[in-house]
Amino acid sequence: MDIEIKDVEHRYQMKTPFERLAIYDVNAVIKEGSYVAVIGHTGSGKSTLLQHLNGLLKPTKGQIRLGEDVLEAGKKNKHLKALRKKVGIVFQFPEHQLFEETILKDIAFGPINFGMSREKAEEKAREMLKLVGLGAELSDRSPFELSGGQMRRVAIAGVLAMEPEVLVLDEPTAGLDPRGRKEIMDMFYSLHKQRNLTTILVTHSMEDAAAYADELIVMHKGTVKAKGTPRELFSRKDDIAALGLDLPETIKFQKRLEETLGITFKAPILTIEEAASEVKALFQEENAL
């Protein structure tokens, strides 16, 4: 399903002395099957926006259309439960949401809550364990006996067990080491492709945004300031800097290489693999002279 965000505003604690405008005039269209990264500084409104996508927050102005479902300011939505099954959110440190006595029960909890039989829910839980790279032998263990990275995978499996059409990731690699971060991000990308998910990544990492997303949405001080593909946006270095954002390390490397060698690459280098390929091509070109 496509997601259309139209003139959305959200104010916290409305009509109190503590009223605060969090986001305003937010407009965006996210196509079914796309991988979109929402980037911006802390406090830019990224997390507030994502909580609107399954009705955890409702707009105080404007509307969000998710397929046939519409979340609109001032109107009740009778189908929030069904919507929350379609839109799964993986929050920062999702392992903090684990609570059951066994891994199998924890993953099966959501499907059972949505009406699936226990037998089918546990079968689904075993399938999701395998999908996130954990063995079936762990199913009867307490989730609190696992490593931090394994606990995170169990929590992610619990979201995937709901079979969402849209997967929203709020800083999903927070607190992980570089290896763990890459493993988790590669896993999400693989799931995105295999299951034709619409994936929305909220991140501070310009590297992850550049490497995985089809499109970027830049939030700044509560509203959308820029949209485009990673190559389009990261080629506008001055605009990115003006929004207080850093460039991916690969583009910083590209810039140093261009300054040192007096050359200009045709397009921004977004991944380590692209950087390695460009450097290899430079050496081959030099050796051919």
Curated annotation (Swiss-Prot):
PROSITE patterns: ABC_TRANSPORTER_1, ABC_TRANSPORTER_2, CBIO. It is a peripheral membrane protein. ATP binds at residues 40-47. SMART domains: AAA (SM00382). One of its GO terms (cellular component) is ATP-binding cassette (ABC) transporter complex. CDD domains: ABC_cobalt_CbiO_domain1 (cd03225). Keywords: ATP-binding, Cell membrane, Membrane, Nucleotide-binding, Translocase, Transport. ATP-binding (A) component of a common energy-coupling factor (ECF) ABC-transporter complex. Unlike classic ABC transporters this ECF transporter provides the energy necessary to transport a number of different substrates. Belongs to the ABC transporter superfamily. Energy-coupling factor EcfA family. This is Energy-coupling factor transporter ATP-binding protein EcfA2. It comes from Bacillus licheniformis (strain ATCC 14580 / DSM 13 / JCM 2505 / CCUG 7422 / NBRC 12200 / NCIMB 9375 / NCTC 10341 / NRRL NRS-1264 / Gibson 46).
